[in-house]
Amino acid sequence: NCDVRSEINIDIPVTSEDVIFNFAAVHRTPGHPDQAYFETNIRGAENVCAFAEKFGIKKIVFTSSIAPYGAAEDLKTEETLPTPNTPYGISKLVAEKIHTIWQAKKLNERQLTIVRPGVVFGKGENGNFTRLYWGIRGGKFFYPGRKDTIKACIYVKELVRFMLYRLENHSEGVELYNCTFESAFTIEQKVE
């Protein structure tokens, strides 16, 4: 456990064979001052990559977000031009670039997998899906806007399985994957 906003000094054995799974982020939007997204997500990426550099770690799996695409409901692919429009989305795109620069310094030796998950749900997330479930179960649910709002999502265990699979089956260079279930359902479909 460490604070990625500062230089990472952890007292554990580290080898070049280790893998870094970088999950560190300030992510709830809205909910934080703009500066918090940049300080944690960008400075954190710098410090994680510096730690990997210092110990010769060759593999990083970075969890970004679909937020670099900006707020829109049309289908996005990994080739879609990112157009982030929130501090969170901007900070995650910059963090991706920082990780990519780390990988490019030793192109043939380092692996970088970037995953861009949608809304992640599962036990303990206490976010959108948990609130939706308890609202419906308690008979207190109401639509907080449009019924046809689309939210791309993925179950946390499926995301982890995918990351482990990619780690074992990585191609050279940088791999970038959007991680959401197909099809993305409307909030009305999820409620039903």
Q: What is the meaning of each model-derived region?
A:
Residues 169-192:
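Mid/C-terminal beta-alpha module of Rossmann-like enzyme folds, strongest
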Residues 125-131, 145-168, 174-178:
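Substrate-positioning beta->alpha
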Residues 39, 43, 73-121, 125, ...:
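Catalytic helix-loop patch of NAD(P)-dependent Rossmann-fold dehydrogenases
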Residues 47-87:
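Conserved Rossmann-fold NAD(P)-dependent oxidoreductase catalytic core, especially the SDR/UDP-sugar
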Residues 4-43, 47, 51-54, 69:
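NAD(P)H-binding glycine-rich loop region in Rossmannoid oxidoreductase-like domains
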Residues 40-45, 61-64, 91-92, 152:
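Short alpha-helix in the Rossmann-fold core of NAD(P)-dependent oxidoreductases
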